[in-house]
Structure formats: structure tokens, C-alpha cells
Amino acid sequence: MFAVIKTGGKQYHVVANQVVKVEKVIGNAGDVVEFNDILMVGQEDNTIIGAPVVADALVTAEIIKQARARKVISFKKRRRQNSKCTRGHRQEVTILRILEILTGGLKPKRAVAKPIKEEAAVLKETTKKTKATVSIKKTAKKPSEKKSAPQKKAAVVSNNKED
């Protein structure tokens, strides 16, 4: 059985136990992820094409490794200008092993890991609780009196013409 899945803006033709490199998928090594955007599912005698996706189809995969692809060098040169620019870029990729291709609303054998967003929300709640329980006593400083600069004596102006 094979499937065509869509992830990271690209389409991949996958079969069970295949190792494939895709654009970065959120998760850690050993996590199981699901792909719901299945464009086509097929066997030797039967093929189902989705419009745009196949209903009740699911592909599960295990994250083997989070890695970075080869460096791509971008070089620009403007002739007779003494101007050039060299840049390098490494795309983050995820190496996956396809575990199962399921159709008809079947559930996967291995449990799928919790989404990262839920874990982050749980983490935030626990940090709020710990911050509330821990209280730091601070001694209040007494406000100091502001000292003003000494005032200058005004010059005496006389109205006498004798001076």
C-alpha cells in the first residue's frame, strides 16, 4: 500500500517502513506524528484519489532525527562594480520512518504524542502555580528626603546715582 502525503508545501510518495526527509515537523526524536493531508492512497489493484484529500485516511510516522540539510550557497556578483555578496543557508529537516498507512477511519497501533501546544499550555500553568506559591519578602526602603541645592543670595541693586 502506498500514499501521497502533503507536508511542508511538498508532496511525498510513501510506503510503510520507508525513511523520508521532509521539512521540519515539530517534535522530538522518537515521537509519533500523524499526517491527515493524504492526496492519494493505493494498492496494486485499487487506487483512491482525493478531492482534494482522501476522507478517513491517515499516515503515521516516527521521528528518527531532527537535522539540517546541506548548506546552499547564494552568490551574487555585479560586474564592474566591485560588489559581491555570499550567503549560506541550511534548511532544517526531519527524518521520518513511515509506520502505517490507514484508511476507513482505523486508529493507529502506536499512540501519537501530544501536540507541542498542549504541552506548552500545561507548562505555563505549572509555572504560574509555582510562582504563586513562592513568595519573596522584600524590605521596604524608607524614602529619603530630597535635599535642595543652597540658594544664592540676590545681589543688592542700589538706585543711588552716586555709585
From Swiss-Prot:
Protein name: Large ribosomal subunit protein bL21
UniProt family annotation: Belongs to the bacterial ribosomal protein bL21 family.
Keywords: Ribonucleoprotein, Ribosomal protein, RNA-binding, rRNA-binding
A Pfam family annotated for this UniProt entry: Ribosomal_L21p
Assembly behavior: Part of the 50S ribosomal subunit. Contacts protein L20.
GO molecular function annotation: rRNA binding; structural constituent of ribosome
GO CC terms of this entry: cytoplasm; ribonucleoprotein complex; ribosome
Annotated spans, Disordered: 124-163
Signal peptide: none
The protein's role, per its UniProt record: This protein binds to 23S rRNA in the presence of protein L20.
Gene behind this protein: rplU
Coiled coil: none
Example GO BP: translation
Protein species of origin: Bartonella quintana (strain Toulouse)
InterPro entries, A to Z: bL21-like, bL21-like_sf, Ribosomal_bL21
